Amino acid sequence: MTDSIPLQPVRHKKRVDSRPRAGCCEWLRCCGGGEPRPRTVWLGHPEKRDQRYPRNVINNQKYNFFTFLPGVLFSQFRYFFNFYFLLLACSQFVPEMRLGALYTYWVPLGFVLAVTIIREAVEEIRCYVRDKEMNSQVYSRLTSRGTVKVKSSNIQVGDLILVEKNQRVPADMIFLRTSEKNGSCFLRTDQLDGETDWKLRLPVACTQRLPTAADLLQIRSYVYAEEPNIDIHNFLGTFTREDSDPPISESLSIENTLWAGTVIASGTVVGVVLYTGRELRSVMNTSDPRSKIGLFDLEVNCLTKILFGALVVVSLVMVALQHFAGRWYLQIIRFLLLFSNIIPISLRVNLDMGKIVYSWVIRRDSKIPGTVVRSSTIPEQLGRISYLLTDKTGTLTQNEMVFKRLHLGTVAYGLDSMDEVQSHIFSIYTQQSQDPPAQKGPTVTTKVRRTMSSRVHEAVKAIALCHNVTPVYESNGVTDQAEAEKQFEDSCRVYQASSPDEVALVQWTESVGLTLVGRDQSSMQLRTPGDQVLNLTILQVFPFTYESKRMGIIVRDESTGEITFYMKGADVVMAGIVQYNDWLEEECGNMAREGLRVLVVAKKSLTEEQYQDFEARYVQAKLSVHDRSLKVATVIESLEMEMELLCLTGVEDQLQADVRPTLETLRNAGIKVWMLTGDKLETATCTAKNAHLVTRNQDIHVFRLVTNRGEAHLELNAFRRKHDCALVISGDSLEVCLKYYEYEFMELACQCPAVVCCRCAPTQKAQIVRLLQERTGKLTCAVGDGGNDVSMIQESDCGVGVEGKEGKQASLAADFSITQFKHLGRLLMVHGRNSYKRSAALSQFVIHRSLCISTMQAVFSSVFYFASVPLYQGFLIIGYSTIYTMFPVFSLVLDKDVKSEVAMLYPELYKDLLKGRPLSYKTFLIWVLISIYQGSTIMYGALLLFESEFVHIVAISFTSLILTELLMVALTIQTWHWLMTVAELLSLACYIASLVFLHEFIDVYFIATLSFLWKVSVITLVSCLPLYVLKYLRRRFSPPSYSKLTS
């Protein structure tokens, strides 16, 4: 048999706005004071505001009470076919165009609209209840009369709000005071940015020093804040106290903010409200939900357009055969109404209900627990993926970091030699604690050991100090929290940090003798092997950013007064910061090839004068309102020169369970896997080999670093001469290639069995997805677990988020959410395949059902001199596509050609779907021919066998039509489910029972005769038997691939 010609509709923009903001008209936007601009907010005096601000109301509804019905109807009738059916129904009010009872056209349309309206109403009610619950939460507001209770919706800009532990922050605020002794608080931000690690926040120093919270109302102070924007990771502002002499000004940054939607994890805080309502960071980052339109839906739209063309052609032919006699234009309209069943009005409803079933089945699958379907509109996409783009860290790997290597240049310590590191640390502190009497000079061996111990100690101390980790003490049932914190109880201590890498490093320093036991915003405590506590003052902290790829900290040792600047970061940036050495680059490469994540650690000693000079310039830069980030970075960079290289650290991130067999399954299914990661080249390559993304006997072409067009041209030519090899390329080289040779590069890359892109920025990940879609026209699936994967996930045809240690941001942004990468195999091979095949069968059967009755109408009109008279009227035409055939046809969503275990065992079955065979122009044409044959057979058979009255034609043909549909469903089903049997018997019973009430259309006495029974039996047999024979012969002599596995 020849292959089907897959449907290839034009790829439209994949996302369309499915959520019109009907509940918020444009004129309401001006009520909040126009365009957002910087503001001055006086503490505790909302009446002093210099502009109008929006109410602090959360509103996630699409519509309000008045716009609900018009909004829903508009969203439905903007689709051509729904509008077309509305015009048909309205035409029945014109006497010259009426073909029967009004309900014949209005009931089906009303049913479709009722399903949509009910679904939207349920969603709106749920939204309203959630919004009301959030807006009604009660908070404490500080006023001159004391503390008063206020609802979240009544909070205003300038209010002083008190938020307790485990309470949600109701508005965007500046952090003024905390009840915590350490003068800071922790936030849980997982609902804002998806990250599960707690964030440290610091109050304004000036207000934290006030004796009580009530004193906030006694001072004259204000906050100057930037205009509202979507950036949740940055903030610029200043705090000014005017009643002091001289006035005090402090710069404000992200560390002083409490964004709405976050939760206070420690203590009780007081903040001043800056932004409310739609100006909240969380609201501005929440775009209207958008739906992806699946390729399957586009293909079905193509088919319905073909059917509409057929409808017009058939109507014109009927009128033409009448020689356009009389009022022929009215006849055209009547025939358009008569053959309107050619376009099935129930197709969209059936497919949407099918998608709901597929989503329910996915959620209920016990073999992929925790899987969530967030977009129920595209389950069929899972069955046709050609390119899978995956993140590395946390997706292919566990994101559970284990410290593996400490490298000092001349010596390296692995897991098997950590006791030596511990010995060096112990010897340093035991020597310091002893004050031995004068003795003979040390031997050479002793000097060497002391030198090595000193180097190891400096490295471990730097690792123990340079981080953003905070130890948190919790009650363990024996010791309460306060006592545990006071005694630094090991069993009660938990480390909180913004990255698993940070926790792994601090846990390792604890294992070798240097334990982080305490930290607040201004100090840090380390416990030594001799139970001595080292107190260090934190002078400055420079947090890690994706742009800088490094972090630093300046501390003062309280016992010696020494000031030290510690820094750690990626080798690509640290190589230009540390003093010249001849081993850094080589050893970084060696450790990366072992699959380790490498950090370079360095330090620099500062004199008091050097630090004071730096601090003055740094404070001045932080007070700048314009270009603050650039000025601050410039000041910090003045310190980052000629730093002393201390060590390299290697942390391993192990592969997730069953990653290798899952990738092998995907490869055998014809899916090409690309790994896009921000990690370094050597680490990414090593992980690709370990995961068998690149097979053992496969060559790897490492695309060398290129910086201009000429170099890119030469390297592409070199790559072109390679065959069947995996490609490894860095983000910098990728950017150059896409700038000058986008088409050539993508053409070559698409031919590779696997591609690894390292040092890849989030925007580049999304760009690669977009280019694959444009250049190949194939469906893409993006898999990730972190916030840097969100853009890639949203850009892909099908986004899958993995719930991991980096939070839920990717999971919440994805169409599907899984808990482990290995679940992806079953999601695609079983659920994706079944969803696509079931929807293909369902859509073609619904079309077949409509074409059958339309063919019968065409034959009937032709026989009776092309009269525009309906064959079936009233309840018959409505019941045909509802209670008589709806349940058996819809039961096809439960059908499957092979068992789940077989689909997983033979992923090659998935390849057939990539060619679009289940739904193609060929299969569509076959079903059209089947419909024409069966419709003609039934109608001509009824005309030949009826005896005297017209109602006999109706009875014979309609009964034969119902039985034919039921038999066709039975012949199509490949794996019977008990619900399918119930659907068949229930539909037949409904038809037989309803015959008693159909005396207006059917002769009840005639259908009880033997003559009726044998005529219906013969017609049904002639319409179905040849198709069964053809199906049997095809399975016998040209069986499909799946039948070979089930026979």
UniProtKB/Swiss-Prot annotation:
Give the Extracellular membrane side ranges.
92-96, 326-332, 863-874, 943-949, 1000-1006
Keyword annotations: Acetylation, ATP-binding, Cell membrane, Endosome, Golgi apparatus, Lipid transport, Magnesium, Membrane, Metal-binding, Nucleotide-binding, Translocase, Transmembrane, Transmembrane helix, Transport
Enzyme Commission identifier(s): 7.6.2.1
**What name appears for this protein in its UniProt entry?**
Probable phospholipid-transporting ATPase IIA
**What task does this protein carry out?**
Plays a role in regulating membrane trafficking of cargo proteins, namely endosome to plasma membrane recycling, probably acting through RAB5 and RAB11 activation. Also involved in endosome to trans-Golgi network retrograde transport. In complex with MON2 and DOP1B, regulates SNX3 retromer-mediated endosomal sorting of WLS, a transporter of Wnt morphogens in developing tissues. Participates in the formation of endosomal carriers that direct WLS trafficking back to Golgi, away from lysosomal degradation.
List where in the cell it is found: Early endosome membrane; Recycling endosome membrane; Late endosome membrane; Golgi apparatus, trans-Golgi network membrane
Q: How does it sit in the membrane?
A: Multi-pass membrane protein
Q: In the UniProt record, does the keyword Membrane occur? A: yes
Entry similarity comment = Belongs to the cation transport ATPase (P-type) (TC 3.A.3) family. Type IV subfamily.
What cofactor is needed? Mg(2+)
Record's superkingdom?
A: Eukaryota
Q: Name one GO cellular component term.
A: late endosome
Can you state the subunit structure given in the record? Heterotrimer with MON2 and DOP1B; this complex regulates SNX3-retromer mediated endosomal sorting of WLS. Interacts with RAB5A and RAB11A.
- Kindly state the tissue distribution recorded for this protein: Found in most tissues except spleen. Also detected in fetal tissues. Expressed in brain.
Q: What happens when the gene is disrupted?
A: ATP9A knock down results in muscle weakness, memory impairment and hyperkinetic movement disorders. Abnormal neurite morphology and impaired synaptic transmission are found in the primary motor cortex and hippocampus of knocked-down mice.
